[in-house]
């Protein structure tokens, strides 16, 4: 996403946030978070897969995207969540942004309720209010996109997530953002292989930025990962955790496609 697109997204997000605050006061939202069952442990689920010698997959539930349009016409979040779990995914990522991705909060809640996997709210966050929203919908983890927030806001979002018992996935796409991300406390770092200006995808981005991360961080490869071979390639750079959406969303048998991606087993 270009800087211009990120600016447009921030503009409509800030309108959304203002409207949401007018509908549900922060105190009411905080009360709703207390009604939720405890977070499931997003980072813990990823680490358990890696400790067992397996690739750890954050499997994404995504109906559409700004660049590709409609990705999955037959869109059933609970069924997709079950298929991902059956295929061996460690966690879910669910789009809740409506204008750009045709996502919705209900998709997150329904998907998480249909399985035992922890779930990430995949959205553009600009206000701690959205972290409370995420928890009130059942999310176990939030996404912080370093390209769209300054350091102070990134820390405020992270602190809010941690106070709610959630994890935070910090997304970077270049060296400068990686340096900023390493000042935060979260051990979960996502490297987006998509150039936000040209939209080009190159796995070499993950390979390059992986060298900057200390060994105590869990690196997540994002974008441009389509095959088991792609996973094996990134593993050579110390990345064994992946966030994958579109390539799996386009498959008829999502469980079999997930299994094939993770293990190299042929799809039946």
UniProtKB/Swiss-Prot annotation:
One of its GO terms (molecular function) is indole-3-glycerol-phosphate synthase activity. Its EC number is 4.1.1.48. It catalyses: 1-(2-carboxyphenylamino)-1-deoxy-D-ribulose 5-phosphate + H(+) = (1S,2R)-1-C-(indol-3-yl)glycerol 3-phosphate + CO2 + H2O. Pathway: Amino-acid biosynthesis; L-tryptophan biosynthesis; L-tryptophan from chorismate: step 4/5. Coiled coil: none annotated. NCBIfam families: PRK00278.1-2, PRK00278.1-6, PRK00278.2-4. It holds the Pfam family IGPS. The keyword Lyase applies. It is an enzyme of class 4 (lyase). GO terms for biological process: L-tryptophan biosynthetic process. It comes from the Bacteria. Belongs to the TrpC family. The gene is trpC. Keywords: Amino-acid biosynthesis, Aromatic amino acid biosynthesis, Decarboxylase, Lyase, Tryptophan biosynthesis. The keyword Iron does not apply. This is Indole-3-glycerol phosphate synthase. It comes from Brucella suis (strain ATCC 23445 / NCTC 10510).
């Amino acid at each position: 996403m270009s800087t211009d697109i990120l600016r447009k997204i921030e503009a409509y997000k800030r309108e959304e946030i203002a409207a949401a605050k007018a509908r549900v006061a922060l105190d009411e939202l905080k009360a709703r978070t207390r009604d939720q069952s405890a977070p499931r442990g997003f980072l813990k689920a990823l680490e358990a897969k890696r400790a067992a010698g397996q690739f750890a997959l954050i499997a994404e539930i995504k109906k559409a995207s700004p660049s590709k349009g409609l990705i999955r016409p037959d869109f059933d979040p609970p069924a997709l969540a079950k298929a991902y779990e059956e295929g061996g995914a460690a966690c879910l990522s669910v789009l809740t942004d409506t204008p750009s991705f045709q996502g919705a909060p209900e998709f997150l809640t329904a998907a998480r309720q249909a399985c035992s996997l922890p779930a990430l709210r995949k959205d553009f966050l600009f206000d701690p209010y959205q972290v409370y929203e995420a928890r009130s919908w059942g999310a176990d983890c939030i996404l912080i996109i370093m390209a769209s927030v300054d350091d102070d806001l990134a820390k405020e979002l992270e602190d809010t997530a941690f106070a709610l018992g959630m994890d935070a996935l910090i997304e970077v796409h270049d060296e400068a953002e990686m340096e900023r991300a390493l000042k935060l406390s979260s051990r979960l770092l996502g490297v987006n292989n998509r150039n936000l200006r040209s939209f080009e995808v190159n796995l070499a981005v993950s390979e390059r930025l992986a060298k900057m991360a200390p060994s105590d961080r869990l690196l997540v490869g994002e974008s441009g990962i389509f095959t088991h071979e792609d996973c094996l390639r990134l593993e050579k750079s110390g990345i064994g955790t992946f966030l994958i959406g579109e390539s799996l969303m386009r498959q008829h048998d999502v469980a079999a496609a997930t299994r094939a991606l993770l293990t190299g087993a042929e799809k039946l």
